[in-house]
Amino acid sequence: KNGGKPVKIAMAFEQDAFSQDVRLGILDAAKRTGSKIIIDDKLPKELNDMAATLSKVKATNPDVLVVSGHTKGALTAVRQISEMKVDVKMLAMTHCDAAALSKQHGKASEYALCASQWHKSLSYTDNFFKDGTTYDADFTKAFGYAPPYQAAESSAALLVFKDAFERAQSFDTKKVRDALAATDMQTFYGNIKFAEGGQNVSKPMVLFQVSCNDDGSKCE
């Protein structure tokens, strides 16, 4: 909500399972907060033009614009928002990190609010990778680029298996599975604890906002 008042929401989503899950979450949040969906658009398959949606945004002035179209959709959205001079109070997106949004579009991407699984600045620690900042530095030194969240979660998965094997004291499938199910630990990536369905219910998503220095030469 905006100062305790319901907000007007515009949204545009790709038609894949992930983006549609995000859409359902927005619909649920709108219902809970009494907010109103004023634009509910499908992104084109090519993800190369969302001018039609942005024209509606300019005409209706929503409080929030939510876009989920993976890497290409994120890049297209920021490019066309800048080109069409769309002024929206809040821009919320997925896949900002995968799109390297701040590097690709610089100042044009400033203030975009991004959902992510992980960020190097989080305070989680472990005894192997230490913390996010250390992991980021070590990964970048080894591979020549900053780690995406997929690399971080894969590294954390190795720690989970290591811990499970040590507790199981066996390679027996059932014993290892039972050990995995009983996992309750912290890694540099976040806390790990599984629900009955196998989902990690202990680590929340994070939000970060793209910010730039005064002249726009550096954004992150």
Q: Each PLM stretch: what is its role?
A:
Residues 78-155:
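Extracellular/periplasmic periplasmic-binding protein-like sensory domains
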Residues 13-16, 118, 164, 213:
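Residue-level signal for short, function-critical loop segments
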